[in-house]
Amino acid sequence: VTAGDSSIYAAPGEEFTRDQALMAVMLQSANEMSVAVAEEVSGSVKKFAELMNWRAKLFGCKNTHFNNPNGLPDENQHTTAHDMALIMKAAADNESFQTIASTASYTIPATNVSGGDRVLTNNFSMLANNNAAYYQYCTGGREGYTEASGSTLVCSAQKNGIPLIAVVLQGTSGTTATEAASLLNYGFDNFNMLSLGDNDFNMLSGGDVYVPVGTTADVLTTQDGEVQDGQYSRQYLFGGTAVGTSVMAATQEEDTSLVDTSVQNIDAARNYTENRNNLPYFIIGGVGILLLLLILLRIIKIAKS
């Protein structure tokens, strides 16, 4: 951490609670607190970066590598928009993260070193209703800037029950929120949720897919996984693109004649996945803090259980 990086100006030896550290990282993008959290959890920044990379792989990230906990410039650190979307999805699904992300302000009282309060204000422009970049459907996110990465932003939003994620990398300062809003508006205007609950028997979970407006269930094809413990997963494809899954109960009466496992559709799904992963690398920027928060929230949850 160097002069000019986002900080709450914590002093050496100053003591903070876990909640205070979380809020400092999320609301103020406090880089020194990110390093302190990494060292507290793993003993060193290097060890924590290994934990971050392991966790990123669990989320499905294939083209991301962390070398520090805050996303500041490092020649061995990179990501893609697709991978950042996967990390943001995990964050959006985490209730504790969403609570922190939606906090407008938080006060850290006097510590063993500081005699006064620190008032932390949420600096994410898309959530601040007094900011020109405010986006009413936004549910959380992060933005950051370094000279190396340019402006970066990841966010989640929900409108009419449809959740979306937008990622902007290597953006121009002051425009990334507008660009993210444009991406979200395009998604909300051109895609909707199609419920397949009435089209399948013995559906246990899932069955909601996101497809272009006007799409009907009869144009979707399906692929079924292997039966395990009396259940199997069914993947729905639109034009060879995977758009959703459901968990089905395996019964003797189940009609498998509707299952489309043609080589053409399998190859289309595989090619789609490969094309999405063959993406250019970008410098992570400050949005790497998201994964740090998810790891710490996971550790806190385990400690409380």
Model-identified regions with their sequence ranges:
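Active-site-adjacent loops and short helices of periplasmic peptidoglycan-processing enzymes
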Residues: V1-H82, L86-E95
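Domain-terminus/edge residues, biased toward the C-terminal soluble/receptor-binding domains
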Residues: C61-K62, P73-H78, H82-S305
